[in-house]
Amino acid sequence: SLIPALSMANAARDRGQVESSVSKAIRFSMIIAIPAAVGMAVMSKPIISLLFGAKNSEKAVLMMRLGSAGIIFYSLSTVSNAILQGTSHMRIPVRHALMSLCIHVVVLLTFLNVFHMGIFGVVFADMIFAFCMCFFNAVSVRRLLTYKQEVKRTFAGPALCAAVMGVFAWFLYGALYRIFTGFAYRVLAGTVITVIAAMALYAALLVRTGCITEYELTYFPKGKQLTAFFKKLRLLK
């Protein structure tokens, strides 16, 4: 949905609408991607246990924890690709992908053949590919659209809220795991409860800290109901 909106604003030469659409797209993607990365890192052990079993899962857990940052980079690169395409710069993301792929191949071969990092080299090389895409796209967006990225409410705020959420989830899951001792599905129960509670806490923190305003809530599905709910909890004034 981002590309048509940007294309219309760009065709009308409405720079204000273009910048507004770009800002909203990046902000909303980071609001989702940053806590997702934190959640995958914190909950990597129970998630791997549920998917593949707990036996000999230490390496897989570590891979998920290390690679979770890639969620942020891939999300940002996907959005920035759409921004460039929606503003009539169709070939630039392709060129950036080719450049990033070349860097990825060189880094991957170095990690595997020089540093002998094994599968972890693949994880880090994949993240470097996504990071390069983000970097190249960001430079082009700034140069072509004269767009200056806001940092506080787009990156710093969600990161702080996600960090609090991550600490909360870590301790809550540990407590639930001990409470459910003897219960056959304690990993599943602990994971589901922790994820739901952590999501609720993160949403409350976003609203309370002003990372999301009442006006911006209306852009979400069931926005009016969410606004009324947060006002009842006195998280919105």
Predicted regions and their residues:
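Residue-level recognition of pore/gate-forming positions within transmembrane alpha-helices
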Residues: K24, A37, P46, I71, ...
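Residue-level recognition of transmembrane alpha-helices
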Residues: S29, M64-G67, I71, A97-L98, ...
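Helix-loop junctions and terminal segments of transmembrane helices
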Residues: S1-I26, N81-I83
